[in-house]
Amino acid sequence: MRKPLLKARQLLLLAYLLAAVLWVVRCLVGCGVMLNYKLQGKMPQTHVDAAELVTESFAPYSSNEWWTPPDDDPAWYLSTDSDPHIYWQGQGYIETAVLDAAHRLPPGGVALYYLKPGQTDYSEAQKVYARVTAPGVYTFDLGGQWVTGLRIDPDSVGGVPTLFTGIDLNPARPWYTRFVPTAGWWLVLAFVPAVAAAMASAVCSFFIKKDS
C-alpha cells in the first residue's frame, strides 16, 4: 500500500503556513494600493465637522426652539425618526471612517453605506457595521474602496440624543495594524486552512486506496 506524501498533521501545518503567506501578501498588496492613491492625493485623511455634512432626520437641537438638549453643548443632535442619515458628499479612496457620536440612549444598529462610481442609490450590498473602538467612537472598516459618497445611519430607533462632532476619514494608525486580522478574518484564517487540509487528506487517501 502506498504511503501518502504528507501526513494529516503535515498537511494541516502546510495549510496554515500557506494561509499566513497569503494573508501577508494580501496586506502588502493593500499597502501598495493605498500608497498609490495617497501619493496621487486621492486618499482623504481629514476630520469633517458636523456642519460640513448633510443630515436627514437628524438635526441639531438648536434647529428647534422646543427641543431641550441634555446640556449646553451645541453639538447635540436628535434623530427625528428611526432612519436618520448623515451624508458625506465627496469621493476618494477610503479604508476606514470613524463616527464621533456619543449617544445618550441605546442607538440600536449603527451602519455605513457607500457608493461606487456610477451608483446613485445606497444598498444593503455595500453596508458596513460599526465597531465600537472607544466610548462614542464608531469605526467602519471598508477594506479599501474608491467611493463617491458615504451614508452613515447613527441609530436605528429614533428619538436618540447624540453628541455629534463629525467624522474622520482614513485616520492615521500604526503601520503594523494593517497586518492584524479583524474578528471575521481571524475566523477565516482559523477554520478555512483546517477544512482545506482535511479535504486534501481525504482526497489523497481516496486515491491511495484506489491505486492499492
Regions found by a protein language model. Give the residues of each.
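Extracellular ligand-binding interfaces
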Residues: 58-96, 100-139
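Juxtamembrane interface at the cytosolic side of transmembrane helices
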Residues: 193-212
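Short beta-strand-plus-loop segments that form exposed binding edges in beta-rich domains
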Residues: 151-159
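N-terminal Lys/Arg-rich, disordered targeting/topogenic segments
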Residues: 1-6, 210-212
